[in-house]
From Swiss-Prot:
Annotated family: Belongs to the CcmE/CycJ family.
UniProt-recorded name of the protein: Cytochrome c-type biogenesis protein CcmE
Binding annotation for heme: 130, 134
Gene name, Swiss-Prot/TrEMBL: ccmE
Annotated GO MF terms: heme binding; metal ion binding
Length: 160
């Protein structure tokens, strides 16, 4: 092999190794920013055909309805515990902070946080549904899959 060809080969190999390393570093950095969405039934029964369940310590978002009678507030702190439910699953959520004004029992919410065990999420953020006609697309799709005969919500914006 002549020296010129050998130098080109070394250069190409170094570029490929550099690109591979850069890709690996980007994927590693983005790994911590991925929050998967689950419904309570997907957390209990598994998601998809493989029935994959989230693992403790995993960051995730879970959406469902606040179970009536399940909201427990600590009178001395901002700590709140409540249960989320859907068609076939119930999970508990604990949150330390100020809840949105629209948060109430029977209301749809999305809690973002870390899974402590199979059915308990420690939420870092709680989002409440902001309009009775609006349902987040992820929740609407999940509810349509669980209840295909029922109309869940309408994402369209209607003039007042």
């Amino acid at each position: 092999m002549n020296p010129r060809r050998k130098n080109r080969l070394i250069l190409v190999m170094l570029v490929l190794v550099g690109l591979g390393l850069a890709t690996a570093l980007v994927m590693y950095a983005l790994r911590s920013n991925i929050d998967l969405f689950y419904t309570p039934s997907e957390m209990v029964n598994g998601k998809g055909e493989q029935q994959l369940k989230p693992e403790p310590g995993q960051r995730l978002r879970v959406g469902g309805m606040v179970m009536p009678g399940s909201v427990k507030r600590d009178p001395n702190t901002l700590r709140v515990a409540f249960k989320l439910y859907d068609a076939s699953g119930v999970i508990s959520v604990s949150y330390d902070g100020i809840l949105p004004d629209l948060f109430r029992e029977g209301q749809g919410v999305v809690a973002q946080g870390v899974l402590q065990d199979a059915t308990h999420v420690i939420a870092k953020e709680v989002l409440a549904k902001h309009d009775e006609k609006y349902t987040p697309p992820e929740i609407e799709d999940a509810m349509k899959k669980d209840h295909p005969a029922q109309a869940v919500g309408d994402n369209s914006v209607r003039p007042s």
